[in-house]
Amino acid sequence: MTFSVKSPILGFEHIKTMELIELDKFFVKLQSKDDETSFTMINPFALRSYEFDIPSYYEELMDIRDTSQLRIYNIIVVSLPLEKSTVNFVAPIVCNMDNMTLSQVVLDVGAYPQYGQAEPIENFIQK
């Protein structure tokens, strides 16, 4: 699935088109169509309860009309063992399946203090 980037991933403002590749039921790969950049992402709902309001700026930018058509992912920094990998819950990637657009939505940390920028996956694994 190819997406047009409406609000860039921080530090990668040059990327305008990306492909979303499902790896399994938890992980996806976001691959730039402009260069060799790629990100491994996770379905946050597989780890925890995860809710936030999408600011109206992004709703307008991505022409969001039906939130049921959104897919939410979070970028992870992969480490070995996998449990040591960290998840960025502060800046989710929002994909609008209606019009194949995506944006990185940077959340207000004051409004969402429960979400961290580098939370280890092991914190969410039941022992």
UniProtKB/Swiss-Prot annotation:
Signal among keywords: no
InterPro entries, alphabetized: Flagellar_assembly_factor_FliW, Flagellar_assmbl_FliW_dom_sf
A GO BP annotation: regulation of translation
Gene Ontology cellular-component annotations: cytoplasm
Keywords: Bacterial flagellum biogenesis, Chaperone, Cytoplasm, Translation regulation
SUPFAM superfamilies: BH3618-like
Subcellular location: Cytoplasm
Gene3D superfamilies in the cross-refs: BH3618-like (2.30.290.10)
UniProt key word Chaperone: yes
Record's function text: Acts as an anti-CsrA protein, binds CsrA and prevents it from repressing translation of its target genes, one of which is flagellin. Binds to flagellin and participates in the assembly of the flagellum.
Subunit details: Interacts with translational regulator CsrA and flagellin(s).
Homology family: Belongs to the FliW family.
Name the record gives this protein: Flagellar assembly factor FliW
Species name: Campylobacter curvus (strain 525.92)
